[in-house]
């Protein structure tokens, strides 16, 4: 392995819950600051970074709607939650001197740029971090699917999936103590074994576009740098 980063352009997916830290809801600016510091390290290594952030720390469309409101409207609220997170993260990045742009799938020009892949790529090539808000802009599609979509559009070398678990397991390790962690696995195996990496739509899209996914725990934000460098961390999912 060389001394430089393994991946030159990445799409980092961070759940909204991760930004809430121990409090589970809202924003933990200590956690956000740590994540921003690590992203800054990546950019200083010459890595171009796009980020999709979930919104579950404020609102989860399907779960919070509980069938008492239209699914599309509940998902629209989830999209707005992701934009709130993007604005918070971008503010912390600006305080730290990190060049950043927020782009949203739904036009809201007062807050952010409207997403186009051409403009996103131009920002990345100029060394800016691009935060993608509002998911894919369509209800019924998860932010994991939005992350894979954006990764494909910007030509990312890999998707870094920062979760609350340190990789892909044969079963839920919180339920089954005999669950085995995979260091590497194929998309076909993930689909055949119904493993909880991403939802089916996101997994299929990543496989179709041959984009590797690195699944790791965000509990130690330095795992982001380790993943970028190609060091053993979490689970690598490939075609």
Describe each model-derived feature in a short phrase.
Residues 1-239:
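C-terminal catalytic "cap/lid" subdomain
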